[in-house]
Amino acid sequence: LFSYREDKKGQVLEEGITEAGSMSSWIAAGTAYSNHDIEMIPIYLFYSMFGFQRVGDFAWAAGDSQARGFLIGATSGRTTLAGEGLQHQDGHSHIIASTIPNCVSYDPTFAYELAVIFRDGLKRMHENKENIFYYITTLNENYPHPEIPNEKGIEDSILKGMYKIKSINNNKKTKITLLGSGSILREMLEASEILNKDYKIDSDVWSVTSYNELRKDGLEIERYNLLNPDEKPKETYVEKCLKDSEGPILAASDYMRISSDQIRPYTSK
């Protein structure tokens, strides 16, 4: 757990088990910039299974009313809360989030990804005044968090939805491309080691911070190409990332298969 600072100018609401009331408070704070001319940065943390699934209509209303703020789906995923029973195992909150056009959603794994996403959200909502809100899922497992890779454009890649985090090229024969998000990225990293050690198979591992944002980019590029048939077709971000990949592509998340399946049209393998 990271420390936090309470400020007299800020406010912490502990509302208990009342999702509708908590979401209403978040919407009130998220629309204060318009209704009361007071700029606020509301952050609502909840079990990810008890967010969009419980208050989906309120989430849509937040989009309609152009609320700004962060929704944090904590302890997310289906494999990391098995001890608490099926009722806590979220496998579809990101699917519901994808139905709201001005909801920007991410499923990061490491702290530096979360920091980059949060900073961009603050800039877009409170500096650029974009009428969007963020849904970010966070995890409950205890694992090491590496430093941000020292690569040019890494922050932009995180925000676009995916970046290569690991590459093994020891065998030069067979290779596979592994895509993982959230808690499953760590399983992909472990899988790459097993493939290399036990089966002599090389691999590229990509951290997918948002299948939803990758799909949005794909739809935007598809529309542009449709409306501009005389121009050279543009490539989606997924196509740019994976056009030189070798072997089969395996994409996974801790959510329903439809989550990673969103980028299937933009892969060629």
PLM ranges: what are they?
Residues 1-99, 105, 112-122, 179, 189, ...:
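Thiamine diphosphate
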